[in-house]
């Protein structure tokens, strides 16, 4: 360790912008702390899906909101400002939230979204906070998958019940209703039907905590379809606080089979109970007759029931909605959530749409039990708050966008592209060039306002890929938000107009996979050839190619899938739901070798890997060569190496086949031999891999995204280490490297786009560097940007992104921490040797300590980021400690 000494690092500007050479990976560092000072930054866009909400009676400005896969946010000023309070936890999907009525500091969070669809994340149990969300502790139930409701005894906060649906990808014992009487130290499964049935809803009598109702739901979902309903589903009641339960049958209730159930007990009159019950609407299923109806009501505490409404608007797509809430001061006033937002004022007999809706795709609602005018609704657009019983709403969008893919162009500064759930394809800047005024100051970067993002055609679930030669042309796709299978457009940024160029225009709404001409998946691939930017590939069950801008398409493959017709049937169970999402037997990934034209890889969502070496004339199935690969996985990503024509990497996702282990492989001989490369990725409920990417500078340096994080390998996948740093634990669906700026861009499915600025420390981190006492990494090129006019925008926006700091970034490595009086000094000189600037770095302050006054750069410890307005430079052992750098750089 350096003690009482000043480390002096000399830099000449003539070397400042030297290009980093290609280097080969060597012995990896064993401690991620080495590069922990490299920080990600969020850039946008506005987010969407929320799934849980609660307020606190008597505290009108306090709300907690749970995102579908973006963690928990809290506001204490009625929704003006929001703070993420769950990012330190290894899970981001929130299924339920509850605050103890006897102690508002006690908050419980059940993880795992329970609104079932193909692209949702699972949880890792239940968490508790004793300080109003400042800190959290995992309290068990790790394998329950999805906890859709948590109920706390109003008088005894240590008594908690959890409604566990299960992961729903196969049978499991960790389903049903669980209860703790000791604050989560131990749990008892108090209601269990079978391993195919879980809890869909749970309700407590507001006046008697011993009386409980539970909806149990038999459901299973796979890549190829969803089955809702069965003998396990039903409505249950307990009169002893959940210790024992009785199935409620007959007495006016629908006969089985039934599916998802939601239940609520009125506060003003606890004899009034409402149950939303999924039926088959009279359509036979598996040869069995089904009943019709939507809403049942009991006026005697659940003893007898009557069907009061059969309007499908109440529950819409049952697996995705089926929720209700009763006004605390009127047992006849009930709210229902689906794509619409409806209300009854006469006990369920008639429905009325609200004069102003909270949004679309509504999922959950909280009404203040002491004030029926105060309410909050979470939906696919964020959270909406009303203080006048729903006559008007304040709509809030949080930084929780669910992004499917990310691509980048090569402009200066570059733009980022991708598709957002419940939105179109988007384009936004990595740097909005607004350094001052709007949310920022001086040379510190400023914010990226939501208004600088705009749609580029496409839809929620696909790709947005710029032409590498003409970045004004963007190929956008997405079957979501529409009924056309394989929907694709060619967007021109110059006039912001798009032209539809899909392979085959076909309305697939309501059609099973076996009925359509081309089986385009919800997120079918678009790949532009690295050898010819006019050649664009897409995948159905075939690989299609265009060379004339989408005017015509040719098939260059046979059906590359298993084509198992038994797994191409109607999806949904009691309520059919066919919109192209659960289409199996589709090409899910396409990659052409950057090294050798005509070498094209294709992966399917029924578990096959195929290769052609002659541009599609002949194909070889190399799946059998992959060791220990189960069947029916989704080949989610193929990365063809830029270094060797025969080398490729794949990730295979099995989570919808009830296997959440990570699967990643490498081949170096065109698929003849494969090697598993997952050592170091921990096995958990959230281990499954989505994407693998090769570094364009350093051979053997790889990046891999899983359902709850990012990993890096310095040795070609032999070992993996976390690269999480400041990144929330949202699913990392896609990865891109911007080569000019050496930036790593991520598409997170729950927290939007994130960028790790400047990968050069990782690209240059070798065993020799780690053995040295100190090392200065060759900096990347810096640009002197001029600020642009600021758009009209509110000063504070929780969904606004963050610009990179202004100026050059200097990264250095220290083997040991500096002592209290030690300093590291960076001396910058010009080509003649004249010193133009010196920057002194002090030891990093303890976490939570206030920064010392003085100039410096806006970076973390051990890294230098530009501008004379920078904060003090700090350094500690490891890579990425930052010091302020000069504004020298190339004009742009």
Where are these regions (language model features)?
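Extended low-complexity, serine/threonine- and proline-enriched intrinsically disordered segments
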Residues: 298, 546, 823-845
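Beta-propeller blade termini and top-face loops
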Residues: 25-798, 805-806, 841, 851, ...
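N-terminal compositionally biased, intrinsically disordered segments and leader/signal-like regions
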Residues: 14, 182, 668, 880-883
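Glycine-centered tight-turn motifs at strand-turn-strand junctions
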Residues: 631, 685, 835-892
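Positively charged n-region of N-terminal signal peptides that target proteins for export
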Residues: 1-4
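Contiguous beta-strand segments within globular domains
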Residues: 785-825, 829
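Bacterial N-terminal signal peptides
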Residues: 6-20
């Amino acid at each position: 360790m350096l003690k009482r000494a000043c480390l002096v690092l000399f830099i000449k500007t003539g070397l400042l912008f030297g290009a980093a050479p290609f280097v080969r990976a060597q012995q990896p560092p064993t401690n991620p702390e080495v590069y922990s000072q490299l920080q990600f930054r969020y850039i946008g866009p506005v987010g969407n899906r929320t799934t849980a909400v609660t307020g606190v009676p008597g505290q009108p400005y306090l709300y907690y909101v749970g995102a579908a896969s973006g963690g928990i946010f809290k506001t204490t000023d009625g929704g003006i400002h929001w703070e993420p309070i769950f990012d330190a936890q290894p899970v981001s999907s929130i299924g339920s939230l509850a605050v103890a009525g006897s102690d508002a500091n006690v908050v419980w969070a059940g993880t795992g979204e329970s609104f079932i669809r193909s692209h949702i994340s699972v949880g890792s149990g239940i968490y508790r906070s004793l300080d109003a969300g400042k800190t959290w502790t995992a309290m068990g139930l790790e394998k329950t998958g999805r906890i859709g409701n948590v109920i706390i005894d109003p008088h005894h906060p240590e008594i908690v019940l959890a409604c566990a649906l299960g992961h729903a990808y196969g049978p499991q014992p960790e389903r049903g209703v669980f209860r703790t009487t000791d604050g989560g130290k131990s749990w008892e499964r108090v209601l269990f039907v079978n391993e195919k049935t879980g809890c869909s809803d749970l309700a407590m009598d507001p006046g008697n905590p011993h009386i409980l109702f539970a909806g149990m739901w038999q459901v299973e979902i796979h890549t190829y379809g969803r089955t809702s309903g069965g003998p396990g589903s039903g409505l249950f009641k307990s009169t002893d606080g959940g210790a024992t339960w009785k199935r409620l049958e007959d007495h006016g209730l629908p006969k089985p089979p039934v599916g998802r159930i939601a239940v609520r007990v009125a506060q003003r009159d606890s004899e009034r109970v409402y149950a939303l019950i999924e039926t088959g609407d009279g359509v036979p299923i598996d040869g069995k007759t089904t009943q019709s109806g939507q809403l049942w009501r009991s006026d005697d505490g659940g003893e007898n029931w009557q069907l009061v409404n059969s309007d499908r608007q109440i529950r819409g797509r049952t697996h995705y909605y089926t929720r209700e809430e009763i006004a605390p001061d009127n047992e006849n006033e009930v709210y229902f959530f689906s794509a619409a937002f409806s209300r009854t004022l006469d006990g369920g007999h008639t429905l009325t749409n609200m004069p102003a809706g909270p949004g679309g795709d509504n999922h959950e609602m909280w009404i203040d039990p002491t004030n029926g005018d105060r309410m909050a609704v979470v939906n696919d657009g964020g959270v909406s708050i009303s203080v006048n019983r729903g006559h008007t709403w304040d709509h809030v969008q949080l930084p929780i966008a669910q992004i499917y893919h990310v691509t980048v162009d090569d402009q200066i500064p570059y733009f980022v592209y991708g598709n957002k759930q419940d939105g179109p394809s988007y384009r936004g800047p990595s740097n909005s060039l607004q350094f001052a005024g709007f949310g920022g100051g001086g040379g510190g970067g400023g914010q990226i306002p939501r208004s600088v993002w705009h749609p580029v055609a496409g839809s929620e679930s696909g790709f947005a890929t710029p032409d590498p030669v003409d970045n004004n042309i963007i190929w956008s796709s997405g079957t979501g938000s529409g009924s056309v299978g394989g929907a694709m457009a060619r967007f021109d940024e110059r006039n912001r107009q798009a032209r539809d160029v899909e392979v085959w225009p076909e309305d697939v709404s309501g059609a099973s996979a076996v009925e359509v001409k081309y089986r385009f998946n919800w997120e079918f691939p678009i790949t532009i050839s690295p050898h010819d930017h006019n050649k664009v590939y897409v995948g159905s069950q075939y690989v299609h190619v265009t060379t004339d801008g989408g005017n015509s398409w040719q098939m260059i493959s046979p059906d590359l899938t298993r084509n198992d017709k038994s797994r191409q049937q109607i999806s949904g169970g009691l309520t059919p739901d066919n919109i192209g999402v659960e289409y199996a037997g589709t090409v899910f990934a396409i990659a052409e070798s950057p090294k050798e034209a005509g070498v094209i890889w294709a992966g399917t969502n029924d578990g096959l890997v195929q290769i052609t070496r002659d541009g599609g004339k002949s194909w070889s199935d190399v799946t059998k060569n992959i060791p220990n690969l189960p069947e029916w996985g989704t080949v989610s990503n193929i990365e063809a190496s830029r270094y060797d024509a025969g080398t490729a990497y794949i990730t295979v996702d099995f989570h919808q086949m009830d296997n959440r282990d990570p699967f990643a492989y490498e081949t170096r001989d065109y698929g003849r031999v494969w090697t598993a490369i997952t050592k170091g990725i921990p096995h958990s409920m959230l281990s499954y891999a989505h994407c693998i990417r090769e570094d364009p500078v350093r051979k053997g340096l790889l990046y891999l995204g899983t359902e709850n994080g990012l990993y890096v390998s310095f040795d070609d996948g032999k070992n993996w280490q976390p690269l999480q740093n400041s990144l929330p634990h949202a699913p990392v669906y896609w990865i891109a490297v911007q080569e000019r700026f050496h930036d790593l861009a991520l598409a997170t499915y729950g927290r939007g786009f994130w960028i790790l600025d400047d990968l050069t420390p990782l690209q240059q981190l070798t065993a020799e560097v780690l053995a040295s006492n100190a090392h200065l990494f060759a900096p990347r090129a810096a640009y002197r940007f001029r600020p642009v006019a600021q758009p009209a925008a509110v000063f504070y926006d929780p969904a606004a992104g963050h610009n990179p700091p202004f100026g050059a970034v200097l990264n250095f490595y220290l083997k040991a921490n500096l002592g209290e009086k030690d300093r590291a000094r960076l001396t910058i000189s010009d080509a003649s040797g004249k010193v133009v600037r010196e920057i002194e770095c002090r030891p990093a302050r303890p976490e939570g300590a206030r920064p010392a006054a003085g100039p410096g750069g806006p970076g973390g410890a051990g890294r230098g980021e530009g501008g004379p307005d920078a904060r003090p430079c700090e350094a500690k052992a490891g890579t990425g400690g930052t010091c302020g750098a000069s504004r020298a750089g190339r004009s742009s």
